[in-house]
């Protein structure tokens, strides 16, 4: 009578004489996870990391524009909230580090790298949420400051020789500055929302990668290899 036992893709046939002959099965469903780790995982993490690094570069560049661009003093309260918080630079640096870790973790999928990616993405989610609040507050303050241009123009236009005290080009410059600053904040807001979504998705992704995707599979694979070696040794002894 022929008895069969299967262990991790290897079957062992026991003949009537007690000789064990290991037989390897054809690759099946058990190798799909390994194929994903080798092909799908690096591609997905590289895309996520690259977009996060792009968000880092754009947000930091726009922050530098806000620092060095000249604008009227009554716009300072609207912009200083975001700049003094350090979000355009520290937050962008956090996004860049997170993206770099995601790319590295995809190419070298080990538990320490996966845990680092999970932690950094969680921190990036909180940072992006705080940045979203700061940018929204700055946009509201900027809208209030922009109304100052129109109200001051109406007041000075009622005075005699108003063109002498407040030339028309200064009014246009005030409005143009308001539009430019609003555009910069809107673009920063868009990429902050994008980073928030990416960081939240990546946090869930790395959480599943760590705890939901066959935990302890590497340990089981090691046990399987040790068992195969023992079976081969017992088989050779039986032949002798």
Curated annotation (Swiss-Prot):
For the keyword Transmembrane, the answer is: yes
Q: What is its main location?
A: membrane
Q: Which residues lie on this side of the membrane: Cytoplasmic?
A: 1-47, 105-121, 200-240
Q: Which Pfam families match?
A: CD20 (PF04103)
Q: Which GO terms describe its cellular component?
A: plasma membrane; trans-Golgi network
Q: Which InterPro entries match?
A: CD20-like, MS4A
List where the protein spans the membrane.
Answer: 48-68, 84-104, 122-142, 179-199
User: Region (Disordered) spans which residues?
Assistant: 218-240
Q: Which GO terms describe its biological process?
A: cell surface receptor signaling pathway
**Tissue specificity remark:** Ubiquitous expression in normal tissues. Expression is more elevated in adult liver, lung, spleen, and heart than in their fetal counterparts, and is higher in normal tissues than in the cancerous tissue or cell lines. Low levels of expression were detected in the promonocytic stage, whereas high levels of expression were detected in mature monocytes.
**What is the name of this protein?**
Membrane-spanning 4-domains subfamily A member 7
**Source species, please?**
Homo sapiens (Human)
């Amino acid at each position: 009578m022929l008895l069969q036992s299967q262990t991790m893709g290897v079957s062992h046939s026991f003949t009537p004489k007690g000789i064990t002959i290991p037989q390897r099965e054809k690759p099946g469903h058990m190798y799909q996870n390994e194929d994903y780790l080798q092909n799908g995982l690096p591609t997905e993490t590289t895309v996520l990391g690259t977009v996060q690094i792009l968000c880092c570069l754009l947000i930091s560049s726009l922050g530098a524009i806000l620092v060095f661009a000249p604008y009227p003093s009554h716009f300072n309260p609207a912009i200083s909230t975001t700049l003094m918080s350090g979000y355009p630079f520290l937050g962008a640096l956090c996004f860049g580090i997170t993206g770099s870790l995601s790319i590295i973790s995809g190419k070298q999928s080990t538990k320490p790298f996966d845990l680092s990616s999970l932690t950094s993405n969680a921190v990036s989610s909180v940072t992006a949420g705080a940045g979203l609040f700061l940018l929204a507050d700055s946009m509201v303050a900027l809208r209030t400051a922009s109304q100052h241009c129109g109200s001051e123009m109406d007041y000075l236009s009622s005075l005699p020789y108003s063109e002498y005290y407040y030339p028309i080009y200064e009014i246009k410059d005030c409005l143009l500055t308001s539009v430019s600053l609003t555009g910069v904040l809107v673009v920063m807001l868009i990429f902050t929302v994008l980073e928030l979504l990416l960081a939240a998705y990546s946090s869930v992704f790395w959480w599943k990668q760590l705890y939901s995707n066959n935990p302890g599979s590497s340990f089981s694979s090691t046990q399987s290899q040790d068992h195969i070696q023992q079976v081969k040794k017992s088989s050779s002894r039986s032949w002798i």
